[in-house]
Swiss-Prot record:
Domain of life, per lineage: Bacteria
Key word Magnesium present: no
UniProt cross-references to InterPro entries, sorted A to Z: Ribosomal_bL9, Ribosomal_bL9/RNase_H1_N, Ribosomal_bL9_bac/chp, Ribosomal_bL9_C, Ribosomal_bL9_C_sf, Ribosomal_bL9_N, Ribosomal_bL9_N_sf
PANTHER family linked to this entry: 50S RIBOSOMAL PROTEIN L9
Signal sequence bounds: none
Family: Belongs to the bacterial ribosomal protein bL9 family.
Protein name: Large ribosomal subunit protein bL9
Keywords linked to the UniProt accession: Ribonucleoprotein, Ribosomal protein, RNA-binding, rRNA-binding
One Gene Ontology biological process: translation
Protein function: Binds to the 23S rRNA.
Recorded GO CC terms: ribonucleoprotein complex; ribosome
GO molecular function: rRNA binding; structural constituent of ribosome
Length: 151
């Protein structure tokens, strides 16, 4: 019997996969426990529509990430901050990923989730710093942050 897997099953099949399995196994275990459904023509058509919608959503999200990457890596996109600093160019306080995201949105209108910034620790010195951002699977950008001394 041909079945369409609804959930991933280790060693048997992945979600959305169509496989031929013994009738008893399909009816008594897979279908009964909600792991699969029978591969009728209507179920196969539904599966194709769902897979196409998922692929379109993936492509749209990737295109949006590419667009944000272009904006972030533009030469004019530099997030500026003013902060008090000591004599050795060390800041009193620090610039966290949350502040960087807020500054980016305020100065350029670009929204990025702060969890996507790969900043191991907050910035604690004056000058330019490059902050890598993982926007999407395979799409990475760099935000340039410039911190100047406050008068």
């Amino acid at each position: 019997m041909k079945v369409i897997f609804i959930k991933d099953m280790k060693g048997k099949g992945k979600r959305g996969e169509v496989k031929n399995v013994p009738d008893g196994y399909a009816q008594n275990f897979l279908i009964k426990n909600g792991y699969a459904k029978e591969a009728t023509s209507s179920n196969l058509n539904t599966l194709k529509r769902v897979q196409k919608a998922e692929k379109d959503a993936y492509e749209a999200e990737k295109a949006a990430a590419e667009d944000i990457k272009k904006k972030l890596e533009d030469d004019k996109t530099i997030v500026n901050f003013k902060s008090k600093a000591g004599t050795d160019s060390r800041l009193f306080g620090s610039i966290s990923s949350k502040k960087i995201v807020e500054g980016l949105e305020k100065q350029y209108g670009i929204k990025v989730d702060k969890r996507k910034l790969e900043l191991p620790e907050p910035i604690k010195s004056l000058g330019y710093t490059n902050v890598p951002v993982k926007l999407f699977k395979g799409v990475e950008a760099v935000i340039r942050v410039h911190i100047t001394e406050q008068d």
